[in-house]
Amino acid sequence: MQQLNPSEISEIIKGRIDNLDVSSQARNEGTVVSVSDGIVRIHGLADVMYGEMIEFPGSVYGMALNLEQDSVGAVILGAYDTLAEGMSAKCTGRILEVPVGKELLGRVVDALGNPIDGKGPLGNTQTDAVEKVAPGVIWRKSVDQPVQTGYKSVDAMIPVGRGQRELIIGDRQIGKTAMAIDAIINQKDSGIFCVYVAVGQKRSTVANIVRKLEETGALANTIVVVASASESAALQFLAPYAGCTMGEFFRDRGEDALIVYDDLSKQAVAYRQISLLLRRPPGREAYPGDVFYLHSRLLERASRVSEEYVEKFTNGAVTGKTGSLTALPIIETQAGDVSAFVPTNVISITDGQIFLESAMFNSGIRPAVNAGVSVSRVGGAAQTKIIKKLSGGIRTALAQYRELAAFAQFASDLDEATRKQLEHGQRVTELMKQKQYAPMSIADMALSLYAAERGFLIDVEVSKIGSFEQALIAFFNRDHAELMAKINVKGDFNDEIDAGLKAGIEKFKATQTW
């Protein structure tokens, strides 16, 4: 029997070790401890960053939101039915990014930027981070250019400027989305790109909106981002940030963009759900402590940036142009309670609010804008000259009318001045009514306001105001097309335009064709 030599054995082992090819890969990996309700707890991820993407087996991704001493709480983006305890999870070193660029115009995408409209892949697009820091004060420029919504009541009394944040607030089924969609439709030929973010809505509702945008030709310059009611809370929470990043692409390159968040109440509810599942301590109305920051960091990204900012961002490729991102966030109230937690937060963040009232809506005044409570803090400087000049008495007339109407119910005999104010207020209220999907041009709006301001409606029956306005606009667009085109292009108000409008209305009233 041959005896084994220990020194030979050790030499063989050493040789084997020397020849062994081990290509080591340094990576931060952990183990899934629990999976429930779209939340995953992971043990062993030592170097993970807040908001970092975490990769699970089967190309499932999550986002780290809770960094604790011995574990990490992450929220899953998408389906998580393939995940189980004991699976591995590894850091990617990247934060969440979504596709951006003009290739997205006319498309419907989910919160992660994946197309869901059946029109094929997006093609070559850039990507950008979902969470970004808003431009600093030095890089901003004051708001002095208008965004025409096409609504008389808004453009005359609560004007919106490029780079402004104007809240649309009111109860459910009162016309908030209709107002925002009309504002998007009105940008069809204005050169403003639009982003519509639908959060927690029914898919059928979103499909109807997309169809309407397509019919009116507004979808071609609009991006629709959808996180419907059937999507996870994580995607509903992320959708507004993703839409904002897509809008910032235009702002940072010297273009103008408009973004509608429909609505931020549902985003706050989704974030509350995530926070409670992550075992964060609840605060008022069970919302987490940072729900104000949730909305402030989103809405601060809407701004008007200076020429220097655009030039610096594009490395000198674009010069002498300012960029803007205008935000129209929507908040749904419960029984008109604007003093609830989320509504008061968003009111304090934004530059004004358009308050829609149930009582007005139910009485047939649509859009149901309450002129007394609605305000635009910075839009006045951006208002078109002719609209600004002619709308001065409109808000006063409406406010006085509402006050006097309540008083007149108790008074039997009214003096002449009060009666005239009531009659004028009735006609102005009727004039402010407008059909859905029928945004008005500057000239059409100026004509209506001129007729009200200069007393041309006094002898028109209240019930005939609507048909009078339609006939008047049709008459001017047919017989005074040059004057209307001039108003639309310049938006100025001078003696020549004043005389032209006056003569035209007098000529129209003489025909009695309404």
From Swiss-Prot:
One of its GO terms (molecular function) is proton-transporting ATP synthase activity, rotational mechanism. It is a peripheral membrane protein. F-type ATPases have 2 components, CF(1) - the catalytic core - and CF(0) - the membrane proton channel. CF(1) has five subunits: alpha(3), beta(3), gamma(1), delta(1), epsilon(1). CF(0) has three main subunits: a(1), b(2) and c(9-12). The alpha and beta chains form an alternating ring which encloses part of the gamma chain. CF(1) is attached to CF(0) by a central stalk formed by the gamma and epsilon chains, while a peripheral stalk is formed by the delta and b chains. PANTHER family: ATP SYNTHASE SUBUNIT ALPHA, MITOCHONDRIAL (PTHR48082:SF2). Its main location: membrane. InterPro entries: ATP_synth_asu-like_sf, ATP_synth_asu_C, ATP_synth_asu_C_sf, ATP_synth_F1_a_nt-bd_dom, ATP_synth_F1_asu, ATPase_a/bsu_AS, ATPase_F1/V1/A1_a/bsu_N, ATPase_F1/V1/A1_a/bsu_N_sf. ATP binds at residues 170-177. It is found in: Cell inner membrane. Keywords: ATP synthesis, ATP-binding, Cell inner membrane, Cell membrane, CF(1), Hydrogen ion transport, Ion transport, Membrane, Nucleotide-binding, Translocase, Transport. The record marks 374 as: Required for activity. It catalyses: ATP + H2O + 4 H(+)(in) = ADP + phosphate + 5 H(+)(out). Pfam families: ATP-synt_ab, ATP-synt_ab_C, ATP-synt_ab_N. This is ATP synthase subunit alpha. Its EC number is 7.1.2.2. Belongs to the ATPase alpha/beta chains family. GO terms for cellular component: plasma membrane; proton-transporting ATP synthase complex. Produces ATP from ADP in the presence of a proton gradient across the membrane. The alpha chain is a regulatory subunit. It comes from the Bacteria.
